[in-house]
Amino acid sequence: MAASRLPPATLTLKQFVRRQQVLLLYRRILQTIRQVPNDSDRKYLKDWAREEFKRNKSATEEDTIRMMITQGNMQLKELEKTLALAKS
């Protein structure tokens, strides 16, 4: 009998899509942080983002994850607005 090729903890389609949303949000946040002109502010924001994502890594509740994605998107928009104001 052939062994299953799937790892024991295979994600469902819904979990896979949520994971992709989280990873995309994380990448977008880090890309936006790279635009921060001050080195110390950039490092602080990068460390903050990394710590927030690590702290919530173990979340499994669907509603909680969806809420955190929404909050992350709002914080990303706020950061983008702040950077746009600083440049003008």
Curated annotation (Swiss-Prot):
Instruction: Spell out the family assignment given in the record's similarity comment.
Output: Belongs to the complex I LYR family.
Please state where this protein is localized.
Mitochondrion
Biological role stated in the UniProt entry: Involved in efficient integration of the N-module into mitochondrial respiratory chain complex I.
Pfam families per record: Complex1_LYR (PF05347)
Q: Which GO BP terms sit in this record?
A: mitochondrial respiratory chain complex I assembly
Q: Please give the InterPro entries that the UniProt record associates with this protein.
A: Complex1_LYR_dom, Complex1_LYR_LYRM2
Which CDD domains does the record associate with it?
A: Complex1_LYR_LYRM2
User: Is Mitochondrion among this UniProt entry's keywords?
Assistant: yes
The protein's matches in PANTHER family, at most eight in alphabetical order, are given as: LYR MOTIF-CONTAINING PROTEIN 2
The transit peptide extends across: 1-19
The protein's name in its UniProt record: LYR motif-containing protein 2
Which GO CC terms are listed, alphabetically? Answer: mitochondrion
Please list the coiled coil stretches. none
Q: Which UniProt keywords apply?
A: Mitochondrion, Transit peptide
Mitochondrion listed as a keyword: yes
